[in-house]
């Protein structure tokens, strides 16, 4: 079983998480940002991970540090995965009513994010929509992963939720074990 724990404390946040890559979609998530909890739960459920996450942040200022640092910690956990015999690449397309999200991932050690999500409103619940892309940047930079995504739709809730579901499915695909593969790189290392 591939289980990774990360604890990170700064002057802005205190985060503790336990991530089981080979889980079944169970979660206990508390960030005190209800919509963020909701989309993280969707990510976990559709990625078939198990996640225990407690995040305390300086929400009296805003939600930026909490969202960013959760992305950092999830990336740190993902970066602990043994790269030998994983599929490395994953992708998913998820519709949600009028919205659709497409995500492609490479766990090849090259952090980069390319995406087209541009929010049409400032917040969904208490979550600042401008932090969505920053969450993925934080996760990519600390998880050494390449993330590409495209989102279409009208409803911000639907677009964001479809994106997190697709991200979970793509990440699940990329982390699957394939004994035939070895290290998936012509360099011989990731």
Curated annotation (Swiss-Prot):
Q: Which UniProt keywords apply?
A: Amino-acid biosynthesis, Cytoplasm, Histidine biosynthesis, Lyase
| Biological processes annotated in GO | L-histidine biosynthetic process
Name the source's superkingdom.
Archaea
Q: Which family does the similarity line name?
A: Belongs to the imidazoleglycerol-phosphate dehydratase family.
Where is this chain primarily localised?
cytoplasm
Pathway given for this chain reads: Amino-acid biosynthesis; L-histidine biosynthesis; L-histidine from 5-phospho-alpha-D-ribose 1-diphosphate: step 6/9
Q: What is the lineage of its organism?
A: Archaea, Methanobacteriati, Methanobacteriota, Methanomada group, Methanococci
What Enzyme Commission number(s) apply to this enzyme? 4.2.1.19
* InterPro entries documented for this protein: IGPD_sf, ImidazoleglycerolP_deHydtase, ImidazoleglycerP_deHydtase_CS, Ribosomal_Su5_D2-typ_SF
GO MF term (any one): imidazoleglycerol-phosphate dehydratase activity
Q: Which GO terms describe its cellular component?
A: cytoplasm
Q: Where in the cell is it found?
A: Cytoplasm
Q: What name does the UniProt record give this protein?
A: Imidazoleglycerol-phosphate dehydratase
Q: Does the keyword Signal apply?
A: no
Catalytic activities? D-erythro-1-(imidazol-4-yl)glycerol 3-phosphate = 3-(imidazol-4-yl)-2-oxopropyl phosphate + H2O
